[in-house]
């Protein structure tokens, strides 16, 4: 089976481990995009600590789960989103207002939709977490 998206596989592994009640999950291979996505999730308290393990190949990440995550997913293809259109995407992807985050990749880095609105930057939509 070929991998279509490393980020989608990583978020799928996190979702499955969270549903089965595991305390930690191993993600491999790793990438910079996965690490930045996990940093946004950690900043909002959806996951605990995570550790990058360099195995001189593609690397591994061990993520500590805290049971707060309901769902996280990837949006494929990565649609271009204007600042004015972010509100429409949050309404479509998230279950309620003020609940969860849409994660964007912008010229200023990977961030959630609220931070992108504050910094007044737009970009491509990566995924969501709630």
From Swiss-Prot:
<dbReference type="GO" id="GO:0006412">
    <property type="term" value="P:translation"/>
</dbReference>
<dbReference type="InterPro" id="IPR000630">
    <property type="entry name" value="Ribosomal_uS8"/>
</dbReference>
<keyword id="KW-0689">Ribosomal protein</keyword>
<dbReference type="GO" id="GO:0003735">
    <property type="term" value="F:structural constituent of ribosome"/>
</dbReference>
<keyword id="KW-0687">Ribonucleoprotein</keyword>
<dbReference type="GO" id="GO:0005840">
    <property type="term" value="C:ribosome"/>
</dbReference>
<dbReference type="InterPro" id="IPR047863">
    <property type="entry name" value="Ribosomal_uS8_CS"/>
</dbReference>
<comment type="similarity">
    <text>Belongs to the universal ribosomal protein uS8 family.</text>
</comment>
<dbReference type="InterPro" id="IPR035987">
    <property type="entry name" value="Ribosomal_uS8_sf"/>
</dbReference>
<dbReference type="Pfam" id="PF00410">
    <property type="entry name" value="Ribosomal_S8"/>
</dbReference>
<protein>
    <recommendedName>
        <fullName>Small ribosomal subunit protein uS8</fullName>
    </recommendedName>
</protein>
<dbReference type="GO" id="GO:1990904">
    <property type="term" value="C:ribonucleoprotein complex"/>
</dbReference>
